[in-house]
């Protein structure tokens, strides 16, 4: 299983944003929508072996959305319809346990630490994407890939990742948009799987 974790530092945790003005009203959920689409979209379908987790930090309490490719339905390649799926998920009451809003989309209360602990307990290896990390190995085909939103990761988040044993890796020396990083990681992992 390949997992992507994107931290949305100002992303709203309530559904009171306009689909007509995502950048201005949602806490930049548009950035996260692009990440979701990059994680799943294929030419004529979606990836079934990927999960994408959005950590929304811009509300009174953080929430986590999980998109699970094995069950995912209704995902289209545009930001607006992806934002509508997020808005629908945010309209249900989140609890400490996962609740499904639409097929393959789940919500729960939680933060980066709680999510990474649960993924690590599944036996997943953690990778933190950062420009100055070690080059991502061409043999990596699965794992948890953690990225920041347009603001990057905070020092506390980087310390947490380090304390949990995340390997800091890079796909190149330049700072790229998170959604572009996801496309590149998917490509690298697809190629690694072919070589096995």
From Swiss-Prot:
The subunit field of the Swiss-Prot or TrEMBL record says: Homodimer.
- Indicate what this protein is called per its UniProt record: tRNA (pseudouridine(54)-N(1))-methyltransferase
- Subcellular location as annotated: Cytoplasm
Q: What is the lineage of its organism?
A: Archaea, Methanobacteriati, Methanobacteriota, Stenosarchaea group, Methanomicrobia
What exactly does this protein do?
Answer: Specifically catalyzes the N1-methylation of pseudouridine at position 54 (Psi54) in tRNAs.
| Record organism | Methanothrix thermoacetophila (strain DSM 6194 / JCM 14653 / NBRC 101360 / PT) (Methanosaeta thermophila)
Look up the EC number in the record and give it: 2.1.1.257
Q: Where does S-adenosyl-L-methionine bind?
A: 129, 148, 181
List, in alphabetical order, the Gene Ontology terms for molecular function in this entry. Answer: S-adenosylmethionine-dependent methyltransferase activity; tRNA methyltransferase activity
Write out the GO biological process terms: tRNA methylation
What PANTHER family does this protein's entry cite?
Answer: TRNA (PSEUDOURIDINE(54)-N(1))-METHYLTRANSFERASE
């Amino acid at each position: 299983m390949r997992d992507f974790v994107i931290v949305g530092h100002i992303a709203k945790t309530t559904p009171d944003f306009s689909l007509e003005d995502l950048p201005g009203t949602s806490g930049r959920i548009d950035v996260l929508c692009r990440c979701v689409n990059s994680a799943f979209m294929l030419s004529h379908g979606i990836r079934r072996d990927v999960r994408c987790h959005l950590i929304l930090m811009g509300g009174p309490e953080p929430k986590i959305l999980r998109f699970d490719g094995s069950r995912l339905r209704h995902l289209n390649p545009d930001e607006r319809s992806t934002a509508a799926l997020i808005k629908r998920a945010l309209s249900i009451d989140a609890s400490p346990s996962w609740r499904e809003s639409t097929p393959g989309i789940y919500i729960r209360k939680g933060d980066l630490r709680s999510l990474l602990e649960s993924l690590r307990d599944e036996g997943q290896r953690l990778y933190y994407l950062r420009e100055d990390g070690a080059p991502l190995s061409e043999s990596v085909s699965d794992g948890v890939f953690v990225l920041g939103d347009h603001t990057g990761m905070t020092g506390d988040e980087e310390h947490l990742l380090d304390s949990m044993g995340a390997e800091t890796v890079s796909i190149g020396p330049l700072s790229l948009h998170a959604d572009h990083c996801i496309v590149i990681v998917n490509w690298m992992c697809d190629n690694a799987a072919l070589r096995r």
